[in-house]
Regions:
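Bacterial N-terminal signal peptides that target proteins for export
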Residues: 1-8
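Early extracytoplasmic/lumenal segment of secretory-pathway proteins
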Residues: 22-88
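Extracytoplasmic ligand-binding site segments that recognize negatively charged/polar headgroups
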Residues: 75-76, 80-86, 90-221
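A ligand-binding cleft/hinge motif common to bilobed small-molecule-binding domains
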Residues: 85-88, 218, 223-241
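A bilobed periplasmic-binding-protein/Venus flytrap-type ligand-binding module shared by bacterial periplasmic
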Residues: 134-141, 177-178, 255-267, 285
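Periplasmic-binding protein-like
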Residues: 192-200, 236-262
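Mature extracytoplasmic/periplasmic domains
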Residues: 261-321
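Conserved C-terminal helix/tail region of periplasmic/extracytoplasmic solute-binding proteins
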Residues: 317-347
């Protein structure tokens, strides 16, 4: 997932403890995104299993990755990397294989959301929450029928009005799809072509925002741009007339996944927590709290029909098929990030 606004579940955090202070079998160190666990949920897990959860949070895949690289002695037992970071960490030997025979609730997951390129057969990751980046349109100000493609954002009529996410891979993926390329390309020439295309877009860009991209729409600062579908849902719940348009070139799909670090000390406990989080009642509670789609079909069946049948949250199969899941691009990530910083600096 991306950066988010901040709230912490009261009572769920036990910070500042030395890893060696607790019995490994009765203590689980869970490192997760901010806003990703409903209040009281981990206490419920502890009550049911006797396993105490030491919970801490991060705001980017990069900070989670750096922490795991720094701590070599098994500081965490369960983490939640996004799509292409699963592939990166798997390829670097940072994750261990997951024994799915210990996950009785694995069958609740949507088969269409399994076996993605970033982790074939889900050997190293289990879907937790998923989402997509598409086009957000304030329908009180802009006719959504006139915005059907990523390419429409380049129209001169939208000068100094667009919001883009502050995410190199997403912004470049938009341009790459516009040009007919894969958003996961490692080809330097294609990445450079996307950069040149984005330079043409910059006169239309008002702001980059990945802290909470729904807020500028809610506050009336922008009416058009890139937007995560979960952020759009939250904004609509607050009364903002915000539509999600699935671009004809394809949306950008991502997934946040439960994974066990290679040096985790409490593998058995991690498997128990994963299985707990895959329970229909638990997964439904998570989805309702954070406002993003659940990959759990049994949980989706428990959601209010207005949520479960919302095509902006749960896009039709043809929309998903047309879109593209983010994957690791290896060393090409340096070129993406370098050019993205140049783009924002006006160079």
């Amino acid at each position: 997932m991306k950066k988010r606004s901040h709230w912490l579940a009261a009572g769920a955090l036990l910070l500042g403890m030395n890893v060696a202070q607790a019995d490994d079998s009765n203590t689980l160190y869970f490192y997760n995104w901010t806003e990703y666990v409903p209040p009281g949920l981990l206490e419920q897990f502890t009550k049911e299993t006797g396993i105490k959860v030491i919970y801490s949070t991060y705001e980017s895949n990069e900070s989670m990755y750096a922490k795991l690289k720094t701590w070599k002695d098994g500081a965490y037992d369960l983490v939640v990397p996004s799509t292409y970071f699963v592939a990166k960490m798997r390829n670097e030997g940072m994750l261990q294989k997951i024994d799915k025979s210990q996950l009785s609730n694995f069958s609740n997951l949507d088969p269409d959301l399994l076996n993605k390129p970033f982790d074939p057969n889900n050997d190293y990751s289990i879907p937790y929450i998923w989402g997509a980046t598409a086009i957000g349109v304030n329908t009180d100000e802009i006719d959504a029928s006139k915005v059907t493609r990523w390419a429409d954002l380049w129209k001169p009529e939208y000068k100094q009005s667009l919001l883009l996410t502050d995410d190199a891979r997403e912004v470049f993926q938009m341009a790459l799809r516009k040009l007919g390329y894969s958003g996961n390309t490692r080809d330097p020439a294609q990445i450079k072509a996307a950069y040149l295309e984005l330079k043409k877009l910059m006169p239309n860009v008002l702001a980059f925002n990945s802290d909470n991209p729904g807020n500028p729409y809610m506050e009336g600062e922008v009416n058009l741009g890139m937007l995560w579908n979960g952020s759009a849902y939250v904004a609509r719940q607050a009364g903002t007339p915000l539509a999600v348009v699935w671009p004809e070139e394809g949306g950008i799909f991502w997934m946040d996944n439960l994974a066990i670090p290679a040096n985790a000390k409490n593998r058995a406990g991690a498997l128990k927590l994963i299985n707990f989080l895959l329970r229909p009642d638990v997964a439904a509670r998570v989805a309702e709290t954070i406002g993003y789609p659940t990959p759990n079909l049994a949980a989706k069946a428990l959601l209010p029909p207005t949520v479960a049948n919302d095509p902006s949250l749960y896009p039709p199969a043809d929309v998903i098929k047309k879109g593209e899941w983010q994957d690791d691009v290896g060393e090409a990530s340096v070129q993406y990030e370098t050019l993205f910083q140049q783009l924002k600096a006006g160079r």
